[in-house]
UniProtKB/Swiss-Prot annotation:
Pfam families xrefs: Ribosomal_L28
Gene: rpmB
Name of protein: Large ribosomal subunit protein bL28
Superkingdom, natural source: Bacteria
Record-linked InterPro entries: Ribosomal_bL28 (IPR026569), Ribosomal_bL28/bL31-like_sf (IPR034704), Ribosomal_bL28_bact-type (IPR001383), Ribosomal_bL28_sf (IPR037147)
Keywords recorded for this protein, A-Z: Ribonucleoprotein, Ribosomal protein
Family label: Belongs to the bacterial ribosomal protein bL28 family.
Taxonomic placement: Bacteria, Pseudomonadati, Pseudomonadota, Gammaproteobacteria, Aeromonadales
BP terms from Gene Ontology: translation
GO molecular function per UniProt: structural constituent of ribosome
Residues covered by region (Disordered): 1-25
Annotated PANTHER family: 39S RIBOSOMAL PROTEIN L28, MITOCHONDRIAL, LARGE RIBOSOMAL SUBUNIT PROTEIN BL28M
Species this chain originates from: Tolumonas auensis (strain DSM 9187 / NBRC 110442 / TA 4)
GO cellular component, one term: cytosolic large ribosomal subunit
Length: 78
């Protein structure tokens, strides 16, 4: 399963670890992904999404129905 937020599209980014001596080694910064079940009243079922806390705030603001419509418009299966 890929480490991508289904709502915001946030993915891992790359950067450097920096030691005290300023040595740089490559590393990945992973998004804070959470698996969360949402009740969809229109479909009378739960939908599990893998998303970041920002994605959860977007769902709080817009509603799960609107966010699911946007995800399905992108072609993702939910």
């Amino acid at each position: 399963m890929s480490r991508v937020c289904q709502v915001t599209g946030k993915r891992p980014t790359v950067g450097n670890n920096r030691s005290h001596a300023k040595n740089a080694t490559r590393r990945r910064f992973l998004p804070n992904l959470q698996s969360h079940r949402f009740w969809v009243e229109g479909e009378k079922r739960f939908v599990t999404l893998r998303l970041t806390p920002k994605g959860m705030r977007i769902i709080d603001k817009l509603g799960i129905e609107a966010v699911l419509a946007d995800i399905r418009a992108r072609g993702e299966k939910v």
